[in-house]
Design a protein with these regions (language model features):
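Active-site beta-loop-alpha junctions enriched in small/polar residues
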Residues: 6-10, 32-34, 66-69, 108-110, ...
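C-terminal helical cap(s) of enzyme catalytic domains, especially alpha/beta-barrels
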Residues: 271-306
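Glycine-rich, proline-tolerant flexible connector loops at the mouths of alpha/beta enzymes
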Residues: 31-55, 108-113
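Acidic/histidine-rich catalytic cores of soluble enzymes
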Residues: 120, 130-238, 242, 304-305
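Conserved, mostly hydrophobic/aromatic
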Residues: 21, 29, 54, 95, ...
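Short amphipathic alpha-helices and their capping/turn segments at secondary-structure boundaries
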Residues: 14-22, 43-58, 87-98, 157-166, ...
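Active-site acidic/histidine proton-transfer and metal-coordination neighborhood
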Residues: 11-19, 55-56, 73-175, 281-286, ...
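Hydrophobic faces of well-ordered beta-strands that scaffold small-molecule active sites
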Residues: 1-7, 29-31, 61-66, 103-105, ...
Length: 315
């Protein structure tokens, strides 16, 4: 087992992301944004500079976590699908150069003006995800699906249906402990309750190959819409983080665990002031504190953290 992190929540530039990673004694970054650019959108010169910086620092990319079929992509819009496909085709050769074998992908947004799981719409979603996964499979890349604000994130049932429909060894699950804290369990009739992280995790455990650590609290809204989360340190919200970490240990989990705090900056919030020195300093310090608190939580859950590099084993 190893630790990683979305270090762009600490620093926008790669040098800063490498710095906080090494300060923690870790060796991996889950790459998302570098100075506002993605692996699939930076030019060749920018990528070569990134590759050199990582090599010199001895830091690796365990997963590319960006915009493929995410919550901004409509399943009915072919231009959204083509954008995801283009990003994937651009990113894969660069992932291969970096030795990165996992992509964090999703399963398109849930439309507000129609049922998100009608048989007709499911057919569209399954076909498009299948095509993206096939590209990954043909290139030795694993498509790790995250339970976010997407079709698969509607409930554990939808995620399991997606697994059955895609039916590929290159399609596995990235389980995010915090996303069920504010996503609705869209099964049965409205009003839908908020999901249980523990239920989602337990139902999908056999397919989970990577874990994102996030935690939050949220109260149901009177109108039945998705509630607004307040992000917390891991273990302080309703994400069942401790129970999940104990179960991962007891079930012999040996994959990666990536920090995605959101307590210093909400990645989806484009209006936040991210440029002030005070904001930059806060994001860096809160990211480091989050990661250190989580490693302590891991020890409390029976994990033994082995030396440098962010590796762990069960006690």
């Amino acid at each position: 087992m190893f630790f990683s992190g979305f270090a762009d929540e600490a620093c926008a530039d790669l040098a800063g992301q490498i710095e906080v990673t090494k300060e923690l004694g870790w060796r991996y970054i889950e790459l998302r944004n570098v100075d506002g650019k993605m692996l699939g959108t930076m030019d060749d010169r920018e990528f070569e500079a990134l590759e050199q910086q990582l090599s010199e620092a001895g830091v690796s990319i365990n997963c590319y976590g960006r915009a493929v079929a995410n919550w901004a992509c409509h399943p009915r819009k072919d231009e959204d699908f083509e954008k995801s496909r283009k990003e994937l085709l651009t990113a894969i050769p660069r992932m291969q150069k970096l030795g990165c074998k996992m992509l964090r992908g999703m399963s398109f947004l849930v439309p507000e003006d129609e049922p998100g799981d009608s048989p007709e719409l499911e057919g569209i979603i399954f076909a498009k995800v299948r095509e993206l996964v096939k590209i990954c499979e043909d290139n030795g890349i694993v498509y790790g699906h995250e339970n976010c604000m997407n079709y698969g994130g509607m409930s554990y049932v939808h995620t399991l249906k997606l697994i059955d429909a895609v039916d590929s060894p290159a399609f596995t699950l990235i389980f995010d402990t915090g996303n069920p804290c504010f996503n609705l369990r869209q099964l049965g009739s409205k009003p839908y309750p908020i999901q249980s992280s523990w239920e989602f995790y337990r139902r999908c455990r056999p397919f989970i190959t990577h874990v994102h650590i996030k935690d939050a609290v949220a109260l149901p809204k009177a109108d039945g819409s998705r509630p607004d989360p307040r992000y917390t340190f891991a273990g302080d919200g309703t994400g069942d983080v401790r129970a999940i970490m104990i179960d991962l240990r007891e079930s012999g989990y040996d994959g990666g665990i990536t920090m995605e705090p959101h307590v210093g900056t909400v990645f989806h919030d484009q209006n936040a002031d991210k440029d002030s020195e005070e904001a930059k300093s806060f994001r860096r310090s809160i990211y480091l504190e989050y990661c250190r608190r989580f490693t302590q939580l891991m020890k409390e859950c029976g994990w033994f953290l082995e030396g440098p590099g962010g590796h762990a084993a069960k006690i």
